[in-house]
Amino acid sequence: KPPTTTREALEWKFSRAAQTSLANYSFYIGATNDNIDEVLKADYRRVCGIKVFMGSSTGNMLVDSPEALARIFAEAPTLIATHCEKEEIIKANKEKYIEKFGKDLSVIYHPLIRSAEACYASSSEAVELAHRYNARLHLLHLSTAKELSLLSDGPVEEKQITAEVCVHHL
């Protein structure tokens, strides 16, 4: 029942899963530009991490405020999982295609609006913040080869920054 941006919604999810799940589970709490205090009060013995959408996505779950991002990376006592797309680049690309082709854009413009440049710029920012604040970061759903250059080689148990891809994106 997304978005899970409050401890109350998170408790509802845990309660529901306790009644219905046949597998081990945990949940992320979702950050927004204005719920950082709430996010930081979560019980991180139960919550697997903080989910951050750095590009607009579901409801109000965008976190594009530099102050909010810095606070999350500086104060998070747990893993930060980011969906990385640079909002300013997305907006500029969308405006460009709307100006050229009108408001009813075809789905073929999706990868042009949410471009490789938008992904790399945002992933770079997340990695820089993780290094600056010594935060544990997981980059969700990498979509460009260039983003791999942001990651270091070595055993996973020694990594501060990890990532994954979705097979259907390859």
Regions picked out by a protein language model, each given a short descriptive name:
Residues K1, S56-S57:
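A short, flexible beta-alpha/helix-coil linker loop
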Residues K1-T20:
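Metal-associated gating/positioning segment near the N- to mid-region
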Residues P2-T4, A23-N35, H110-E117:
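Active-site mouth loops of central-metabolism enzymes
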Residues D37-V52, T58-L170:
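Histidine/acidic residue-rich metal-binding segments in metalloenzymes
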